[in-house]
Structures are given as C-alpha cells and as structure tokens.
Amino acid sequence: MAVLASWVWVLAGCFCAAVAEVSDSSDPYPPLWEDSPEQLSDYMMEDGNYIINPWVYTDRMGMYRILLEETAMYFAKYGPENEQNLLWGLPLQFGWQYQSGRLADPTGMTDCGNELNESLCVSVDSWWADINYYLSVIPFLAAVDSGITGISPNQITILPPPKDQMRFCYNVSDCQSAVPGTMNRWRDFFQYMQLNSSDFDGLLNYLWEAHASSLDYPTSAFGDRYNFYSEKEANFEENWAIAVNYLAAARLPTTQNRTYSFQRGLPPRVLVDTDIAPFIPDFTPLQNEVLVSLKLLGDTDRNSGSLSLTLWENLMSTKLARTLFLKAFEEFLATSS
C-alpha cells in the first residue's frame, strides 16, 4: 500500500507541475482540430448515409468534435465555452497519440502515418489506434443511438480498415453484440447526461465506467501488436492501460484545460530500447518522471495480482476521499505556481 501511495502522490505532483507549465496556454486543442468535421454534413454522403473513415485521423477526430458540439448544452451549467465538458479527454488523448507518432504503422511495412503524403493515415497495426477505436467509434455510435445527434444509427456508415476487419465492429447492432457491456455503459452515460437531475459527479462516474470498459476487449484482443514495438514502448502501453483503472477509481475530471495540461507529461515520441527513464535526454524531467511513475504502478499492479487496484478502489469509494485527492492536486498546483 505504501508503494501504491507513493505512485499516487508522484503522479499528483506530475499532474500539477504539468498544469503549472501550461496554465497560460491559449490553444488547448488537439492537432488539426479545425480541419476535422464539425458536423455530420461535413462528411461525405452516399445513399443518404454519412461515410466516416476512422482510419483517417481527421475523420476519427471529427467524431469527437461532433460529440463535443452536441453535448455542450449539458455541460453549460458547469462552466463557459464547453471547457468543463468531460469528453475533452478523448480527443486530446487521440491528438497526443497522433502528434507523438503512435498512430503510424509501427512495422514500417507501409507509409501509413510515416510519410508526408500519408500523414493522416491511422494504421490498423498501431496498438494505440486499435485501442482508441473502441474509445471513439463505440462512444460515437452509443451517442447516436441515445439520440444525442438527432439522426438514426442507420444513417452512419463506418468504414473498415484495410485488414483485420473481423476484429472491429461498425454499427450499433454489431457493436452491441461484440462489446455489449461497453455499449451499454456509454449509452448509460449519454442517457444520464440528458436527465435534468444529472450532476457533475454522476457524469464523472458514468464516464469513467464507460472509459475503463472500453479497454476490456481491445487490450486482450490486440496483445499481438506489442510485437511491433520496442520492449520499452510495449511496457509503456501495458502500464498506460493499467493506469486507466486507477484514474477511473479516482474519477479525475477530464475537462479541457486539465487534460491538455496533464498531457505535457506524456512521452513526445515512441519509446525505443535505449530509453531509460528518468535519464532520457530528449524528454523533460516531467516526462521522465511520469514514465517512472507509470512503471512503478504497472509493476505494483502485476506483482499484487491487481490487489493494489482493489485497495485503491476501496480507498476512492467515497466522495470525500475523491474530493481530498483532487484537493491535493490543487495544493500541488498552488505550490508549483
């Protein structure tokens, strides 16, 4: 438990140091945000259907942008300009994956994401892209099915990747069969959002339940993708997926500025075997420290058989505990500024 606590407080320090670094940022948006579809009519249409290719960066980002637009009214009471919308965590995370080269073909066998003329290509061989598929297409389809966009799910056509087509789902009925728990949790989130009685803490709870559920299938289904990466990057991927469960228990608010700030601590490129944190020379001290913290968490989780996660979930089971934890973020921020 002491090891777990040390990771939590190190990560809290990393988070707040990152917030302090970019608190004056005037552009907390993902790359190519303005070039991504803002409304469904910005996508190509065929036979009355909107055609979305999630293997093109801007097409996939467009699904997030539309979700942010369509759900803005439900977050207006929590702050201006949609900044408090909890869905910001998804496009900002996807944008970091793109900017750091993690959506490109890790095998090097194609130009996808690796050459200028293929810069928007999202590779089906990318572990990050495959995991993110279930954090983009699934919530989007669940939102459409929940009436958020005002159109029928039958009006959406999701295009398949060039290979491994059977490892993905493409419409509401198929995804409901393939990942029923995940679809249900995202639908619960969007339906709860539309209730007059919904509140911020309730939204956080539903969001993180859906987010964590979204990783259940792909993290097991795409384990073969680890073979395409260095041991250091593969280990980082495993640790990142583990960390999501701990962040979910703490219900960290994935608002725009918080998420954008936090990501300054994430590695700016794909890791190679010679990278040894905290001594990676082209990474900032913060980025090095985050890698060390994530490794500590991952090792603790694996060595304890996830008992550490159970203990952490029990610790974070009350609103008071979560409030105190979030307050610690603010205290670290105050001392860092």
Curated annotation (Swiss-Prot):
A cellular component term from Gene Ontology for this protein is: extracellular space
Stored InterPro entries: Leg1 (IPR008499)
Q: Which Pfam families match?
A: Leg1
UniProt keywords, alphabetically: Developmental protein, Glycoprotein, Secreted, Signal
Cell compartments where the protein resides:
Secreted
Q: What is its main location?
A: secreted
Instruction: Please list the residues annotated as glycosylated.
Output: 171
* Signal sequence region: 1-20
Described purpose of this protein according to its UniProt entry: May be involved in early liver development.
Family statement drawn from the similarity comment of this UniProt entry: Belongs to the LEG1 family.
Q: What name is this protein filed under?
A: Protein LEG1 homolog
